[in-house]
């Protein structure tokens, strides 16, 4: 097996308390990294009621990515950060995102939050010649009429990834992303619980199944690894073929 070179590295997964973010956090933990995660609840114990939140072995920090001061104050230890994963994300259903205030709130978390965190750790990542991985969505590439704010914010994350990769390449910082398709998480339970919608989603995926948080974690670990050392500015689509059609 090729060593990804992540043993002992300092990793921060913003939004790593559940779903895709939690899968990513544990993928790094399995490689020997020191993994920090953020969430919005006061303490790690407050996530015990969520079955998909496994915080064992992870260092928890409360963070509201909408708060500039809170992001600036975030401290994960003396060692500089090696890998930043921006996995924050909110979505609203029932056409709620057509409300301009709801739209703005989603953009503030999903897109501006990623920029805030990237700026906060730019100096660290310059020191370590580290990398940023932004968790986008297949919605970066296809229409999502029910969630215009989610798709717009994740689409913005695609171009932010390219812009930061270009701007910070001279600092030795790589910036990439992944664009997951349908993944079984707390955010997608509404679709899973609707038999018609779920069956339709399966028919739209060439692999005929949804992805898992662990599979997304594998892609992110690769992007952060030494095997991807000449890769930057890319958004890797991990969607089972959803966007091929």
Language model features: what each stretch is:
Residues 1-2, 142, 220-221, 232-245:
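Short C-terminal tail/terminal secondary-structure segment
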Residues 17-18:
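Conserved glycine-rich cofactor-binding loop
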Residues 94-107, 201:
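Substrate-binding pocket helix/loop in short-chain dehydrogenase/reductase
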Residues 118, 153, 161:
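Active-site helix of classical SDR
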Residues 123, 166-170, 229:
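Alpha-helical segment proximal to the catalytic Tyr-Lys
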Residues 137:
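Residue(s) in the substrate-gating loop at a strand-loop-helix junction
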Residues 177, 196-227, 231, 238-240:
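C-terminal helical subdomain
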């Amino acid at each position: 097996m090729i060593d990804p070179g992540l043993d002992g590295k300092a990793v921060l997964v913003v939004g790593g308390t559940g779903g895709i973010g939690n899968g990513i956090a544990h993928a790094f933990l399995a490689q020997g990294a020191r993994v920090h995660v953020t969430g919005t609840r006061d303490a790690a114990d407050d996530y015990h009621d969520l079955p998909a939140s496994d915080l064992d072995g992870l260092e928890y920090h409360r963070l509201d990515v909408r708060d500039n001061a809170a992001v600036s104050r975030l401290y994960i230890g003396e060692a500089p950060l090696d890998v930043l994963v921006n996995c924050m994300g909110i979505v609203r259903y029932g056409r709620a995102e057509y409300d301009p205030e709801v739209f703005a709130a989603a953009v503030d978390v999903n897109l501006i939050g990623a920029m805030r965190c990237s700026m906060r750790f730019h100096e660290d990542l310059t020191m370590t010649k580290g990398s940023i991985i932004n968790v986008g969505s297949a919605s970066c590439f296809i229409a999502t009429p029910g969630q215009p704010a989610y798709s717009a914010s994740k689409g913005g994350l695609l171009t932010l990834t390219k812009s930061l990769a270009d701007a910070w390449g001279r600092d030795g910082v790589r910036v990439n992303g992944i664009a997951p398709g349908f993944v079984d998480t707390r955010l997608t339970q509404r679709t899973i619980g609707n038999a018609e919608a779920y069956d339709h989603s399966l028919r739209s995926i060439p692999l005929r199944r949804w992805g898992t948080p662990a599979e997304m974690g594998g892609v992110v670990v690769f992007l952060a690894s030494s095997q991807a050392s000449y890769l930057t500015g890319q958004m890797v689509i991990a969607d089972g073929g959803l966007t091929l059609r």
